[in-house]
């Protein structure tokens, strides 16, 4: 974890304090499934990773990466090609589980919760289906209950939000998550048929209150661009007047119609990066008085 004396850590603490003054909590992003090839664990703890051999790297160089003579599996979602720029952590390794618990406890010293990227990938059932014998012996305890209980022993009020798909939201709620993405409701609203939406909302209240509702996020198109205006208003009423967590994306209130990725593709990465830095500086300088020159774009 970064040194508490580093400027960006101090800035994070200031941001957290400003949020608290406004009755808000700070949630940071946590990626449990994979790390970059230059992560210190690659050299110090290669057993924390799903491993391969020279044959794997030769047969499938898009899925296995040689790092200083050691072959590691690249991170992956089982339904898509591997992410060639990251290495897959082994959720079944007890040493990794202990290290992750220490890491998240350190993160919990600096914020009020974490959004867990692709949380379902670390569930025992999913991980075993994805990696088979490469993962080794399946632990008796599941990944998330073990981690969540370890963190809450030190930080009782710490919140866990799961990015979740494949209709595993309920299972993740039962494993300790405070909230899970309600991607199913989003998809049904996008499809525009009333009956599936109505049936979805008939789920039990204890499921509903732990659902995170959204109309856009960094992986989805802008709501202002993807919904017809009349449908958009109705979808917003349904989404944000339901029990549970209300999830809003940067730029959603201003009605932005393009994402940063689209901006980079349209204007070039350099111009998009300049715009992003200008926005960041504006937020730091005047967080309550922003002139958003991209509103409606």
Question: Where are these predicted regions, by residue range?
Answer:
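Active-site and adjacent substrate-binding regions of carbohydrate-active enzymes
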Residues: 1-297
């Amino acid at each position: 974890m970064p040194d508490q004396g580093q400027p960006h850590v101090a800035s994070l603490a200031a941001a957290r304090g400003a949020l608290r003054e406004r009755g808000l909590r700070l949630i940071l992003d946590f990626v449990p499934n994979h790390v970059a090839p230059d992560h210190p664990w690659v050299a110090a703890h290669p057993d924390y990773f799903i491993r391969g051999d020279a044959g794997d790297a030769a047969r499938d160089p898009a899925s296995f990466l040689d790092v200083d003579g050691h072959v590691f599996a690249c991170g992956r979602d089982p339904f898509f090609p591997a992410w060639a720029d990251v290495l897959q952590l082994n959720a079944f390794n007890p040493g990794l589980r202990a290290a992750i618990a220490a890491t998240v406890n350190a993160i919990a010293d600096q914020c009020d919760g974490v959004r867990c990227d692709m949380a379902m990938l670390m569930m025992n059932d999913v991980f075993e289906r994805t990696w088979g014998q490469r993962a080794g012996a399946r632990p008796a305890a599941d990944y998330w209950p073990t981690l969540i209980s370890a963190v809450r022993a030190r930080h009782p009020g710490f919140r866990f939000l799961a990015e979740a798909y494949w209709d595993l939201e309920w299972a993740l709620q039962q494993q300790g998550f405070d909230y899970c993405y309600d991607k199913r409701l989003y998809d049904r609203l996008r499809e525009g048929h009333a009956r599936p939406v109505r049936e979805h909302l008939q789920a039990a209240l204890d499921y509903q209150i732990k659902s995170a509702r959204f109309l856009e996020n960094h992986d989805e198109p802008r709501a202002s661009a993807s919904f017809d205006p009349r449908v958009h208003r109705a979808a917003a009423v349904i989404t944000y007047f339901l029990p549970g967590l209300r999830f809003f994306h940067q730029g959603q209130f201003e009605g932005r119609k393009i994402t940063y990725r689209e901006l980079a593709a349209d204007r070039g990465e350099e111009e998009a990066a300049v715009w992003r830095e200008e926005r960041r500086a504006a937020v730091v300088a005047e967080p309550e008085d922003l002139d958003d020159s991209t509103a409606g774009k």
